[in-house]
Structure formats: structure tokens, C-alpha cells
Amino acid sequence: MKYKIIGFTCCFAVILIAVFAPLFYKDYRKTERIHQHEQEIPQEPCTDPADGGLCTYLPIVKIDTDGVVIPGRPIKDDGNNRIYTRAADGETTIAAQMDIIGNDSKEYHHANETADVSSAIRIRMRGNSSREFDKPSYAIRLVDKKGENNPLSIMGMDAHHEWVLYGPWLDKTAIRNYMFYNLAGEMMSYAPNVRFCEVILNGEYEGLYVMTEMITGGKDGARLGLRVNAKHSTFSGYLLRLDHQNAGEEALNSFTTYTYKTPFLLQIEYPGSRNRDARLTEEIRQDFSNFEKTLYSYDYDREKHGYTSMIDVDSFVDYFIINELSSNADAGNYSTYIYKGTDNLYHMCVWDFNNACNNYFEEELPYTGFFLNNRLWFEMLIKDEDFTERIIQRYHSLRKGLLSEESLYRYIDETLDFIAPALARNDARWGSVEQQAKGLLVPVSRNLDSRSAAEGQLKGYLRNRGKWLDENIETLRQYSASSRVKQYNEVND
């Protein structure tokens, strides 16, 4: 298998035999997972500041755009196509200042205190359907005075330069992303770090947000180690995203795209467009196509030349389990990240559980049945008996501990208790849960009118889904039964 050496200064790429890449492999398991809600809540009452401003034990994020409107709101062009607003200079982001108070504090603090962390930023609205919500989410890049990446440790998370301020809106519990990212982080070698915080934008309180580590690679403080400097060269992997194709983004025409195995499109997230030329883009396309061709070939499960030599199998197994348990309807279609690490293997990475656990826009999702067995890449993996058995055994193990009903319920209860004061302030800013719902979910009856109802819905779905999977997880063997996949498994070594 070939691998890349990326020379960013000269913007060229040459081929290196992959056997050398593991010598520089970064083990991202060394970072201990922090679950913010496990910190002790201060027992003494908060001393309100003289100006009556915000007092909280969550970090406070203050953003000042100097009155400039943040771009990225969806609008229609003359052809009735969906486009996004831009800044006055035509850019997709604007310059702003971000200050964080109580960056890693576990005590009460006030909005008028001195910031613990400060940085210039570039900011825009982000998301697909979520850009339509009253409460937007934001993409943030920390920059220095020269406009270069400025990785900083935020809220006790590893230093990074790209962050998402996710504003829960559709999820009335406000904890889906926080909970499932953290659970995935206990299962998998990498999952985005997350922290709850409260946001003040241009002096106005904007409510409860989740500061989220953006999935990116590179040398600039990225915990996802896709680039390692050697003596004379730079070894690099790459990161791809399967999603809607956004205007201005070039799709990667890989094997499953040009053979019409998926209507969704891949984009290269890393290396960024500024750090790759047409030659490097083509090499990534060919390299990933080779993986897909292997996976979709008749000898896909052979030990010598099959998929197992190309992927971190555990990563794909855990991705399957956590997305099936949560019925995360987007997984394998939208917001789906896959990366090739410096270990020369492909890994899956979780992202976006906003629609999970029957919180999907367009229809009510049953708690029965599997869905990832029909999604890209997994539709082939599930044909392999060894892969299916690993899912079954891993699932049973996780249900005895981390993903047991008792453990999940406790996680929900403790997290909701932790953010309760901030949720109350959030609702004072945005109106009652019933007002926020606005019939976004179909049918209308699914638009819950209280936080307690949302909690009950989340717990109820996980209980029913978990019970069904407990009783039916072993039926996954039907997808790898020899009578069903004989045409794929007839090739001998």
C-alpha cells in the first residue's frame, strides 16, 4: 500500500513505501477522557455581581465582532438556490475577539471578570439544516496577529485551533452530542472533546452552548495526529467527510462515487485546499479508491490483500455499535468522517448526534431494525463473518458496563443536573421549550413541550432500542451467512 509524504512548502507530493509510516505513529489514546459533568458543583450560593450580570460555574465565552454581522445565514439566490450570506468583503468569515472566563475553573465566576484565555478568531455560522434555527451554531478558528493558526487549550481540552460552538436547539435535552461524543471517546481511539459553556455575543447573553473540538488534522495542535514531522520529510494521512455537497466545495470522485454506490459526496477536509495541489488531490483520490475497490471486491475478506490490512477494525466496529444504539440516522450518509492515520490504517470518527434517538426531522424512527448494514462501506463489512462476530461480542461486553441501561440513565441524570441552571437561563433567553419547538419534527406530536418530556423521550427510546438490540444483535449473522454472501466469499488465497 502506498502512502503520502506531503511537502507543504512546495505544494507537491511524492510516494513513500508505507512500512516507514508506523515508525512515526502517534498514539492518540494517551489523552484521558474528561467528562465535564462529573466535576463537583459548588455548594455555596453564587454571589451576584453588582451589575446583575451572569454568574455561573460553567465557562463563559465572550465574543465581540465590533457590531459586524456574522456571515453564514442561508438565503436564496436569483435561481432559488440555497446559498449563504458572506461578509462585506466577500469572505465566508469575519474577524472577532474571543475571551473565555473560568476556562478550567470549577468555581462560580462572573462575566465581568478578567479572561483566562483570549484570542483573535475568524467566525461564521455553521451546519446544514441547523442554520435555519433561531439559535445558530458557529465555526471558530483561533488566529494570531498574522492570521495564522493559534492553537490553545480551551476549557481543559487539548490545544487546538478549530472549534465549533454548538447551540442545542432541535435536541430539547441539549445533551445528545455531549453524551455520545464522550461515550464514543471511552470506546474509540479518538472522538471530539466537548465542554458545556455559556455564550455572550456582543454583550448579549446567547444561552447554553457546547464547545466542541473540530475534527481536523495537522501539526497545529490537532489531537487527531495526521501529520508527523520527520528529519527530512513530513508524513501525513488525510481526513475525508461524506456529506451534502456545499457550494464551492469540490467533491472527491472516488470509486463509490463514480460507480454510483452512494448519492452522497466526499470532500477532503485535511489537508486543506491551501496545502494541496491538483496532484496531491488526485493521489488522495486514487489511494482512497484503492481502499474502496478492495472493500467492494470479491476477495475483500482475504487475509493477505483484503480490507483487514487497511482499516482499524475496532474503530469500524465501535462506530457501528454507538450509531446503531442511538439510531443516528445521519451516520453513513451525512456528517460521516473517515481518516487515514499515520499508522497507515483507515479509522471512523463519530460526529453529530443531534438527530439521534428518534430526533430526526422528517419522520419518526422505529426502535427496531438495523440501518448501517445498508450504508456505504458497512454494507460490505457486514458480509464478513469475522466482522459481524466482533460487533456481536463487543456489543455484549459494552452492554454490561459503559452502555448498560443503568449507566446510560445515570449519565443522562447527572448531566441534566449539571446544566440545569444554565438551561433555565437559556430558556429565559429563547423562550419556553414549546415556543422553541415550532413544529420542526414530523409529525407535530413529536415536538415536546418541556425539558422533562424530552428527558423521558430520550430515556424511553434508549430503553426500547437497547432491549431490541439485546434480543436481536445476533441476527446480524444473517448478513454474513454463507448462503447469502457466497458470491463474495468464493475466492481462495
Task: For every predicted segment, state its role.
Residues 26, 71, 269-332, 340-493:
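Middle-to-C-terminal accessory/interaction subdomains
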Residues 73-75, 110-111, 151-153, 176-177, ...:
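Short, solvent-exposed loop/turn and secondary-structure capping segments
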Residues 113-138, 200-201, 222, 229-244, ...:
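Carboxylate/His-rich catalytic cores and anion/metal-binding grooves
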Residues 146-147, 189-190, 205-318:
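Internal "kinase-insert"/substrate-recognition segments embedded within catalytic cores
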Residues 138-141, 161-167, 174, 198, ...:
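Structural recognition of the beta-strand scaffold that forms the well-ordered cores
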Residues 2-119, 406, 410-413, 417-493:
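Regulatory N- and C-terminal appendages and interdomain linkers associated
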Residues 143, 152-208, 279, 289-311:
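A conserved hydrophobic secondary-structure block that centers on an alpha-helix together
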Residues 100, 107-167:
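Conserved oxyanion/phosphate-binding beta-strand-loop segments in alpha/beta enzyme cores
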